[in-house]
Amino acid sequence: MTKLCAASKAASITPTSQAKLAVNWMHTARFFTTAAQLHQLPAVEVPEIAFVGRSNAGKSTCINTLTQQRQLAFASKKPGRTQHINLFALGKQGQMDAVLADLPGYGYAAVSRSDKQRWQQVMANYLVSRKGLTGIVLLCDPRLGMTELDEALLEVVRPRVEEGLKFLVLLTKADKLTRAEQAKALSIARLQAGGGEVKMFSALKRQGVDEVAELLWQWSHPTGAQAGDVPVNAAEVEVEAESDTDSPSKPS
């Protein structure tokens, strides 16, 4: 009888309800802390998922769309000006069960070469040594494809990926492409990612939003979770796209 009850409880979380659970879970995101240096980040005992990518790749818009909050992740009007690592907590109030890390954009910063190099080193150190790092979401503009800096980042994290670190390449601004162009971009990115997971994403059309939310939830809850673990009926919020999303910027 006990086994039947347990099986029934596990079966009650269907793929559809799991996606809804994941979307509601993402909506619990709130600001946790910010740091200008790696050593200033507090150690966390929960899964941490990092969002990385070039400036103008739509990273802030992606985070705000996934969490259904307009201004959770700050998007600077000048690409590359955001130079802090920002952490956002997920889970019920007083019960954090995962962290999202928003890393500074790279490749377009209107700052000095020394500052660029410093931040590239900070990011590399974070990706290589951050304890608790469970997954990485690399955001790319599919109209530009993966740049040399994106490929360099892949090389930095490859040893950890081979050890089990989760990795997703997210092609943002999918609404700018036709279906045929999306299919081509996916094929190219999959080759560049060395067989890693690749998905299309559009904040404007909400393409891939539920799918990505569910994937991140699975990364953070490998043994599953009960439907009562997160609030329900999270309201969907229309997130404004970043002002620089109309045309791709060339890497510097």
Language model features by range: what are they?
Residues L41-A43, R81-L87, A98, P104-T134, ...:
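Switch II of P-loop NTPase G domains
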Residues E45, Q71, H84, M96-V99, ...:
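Helical mechanochemical/support elements of P-loop NTPase systems and associated helical scaffolds
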Residues T2-Y108, V232-A234, V239-A241, P251:
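Conserved G1/Walker A P-loop phosphate-binding module
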Residues M26-L38, K176-V232:
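Canonical P-loop GTPase G-domain recognition
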Residues D244-D246:
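Intrinsic-disorder-associated, low-complexity terminal segments enriched in Asp/Asn/His/Tyr and depleted
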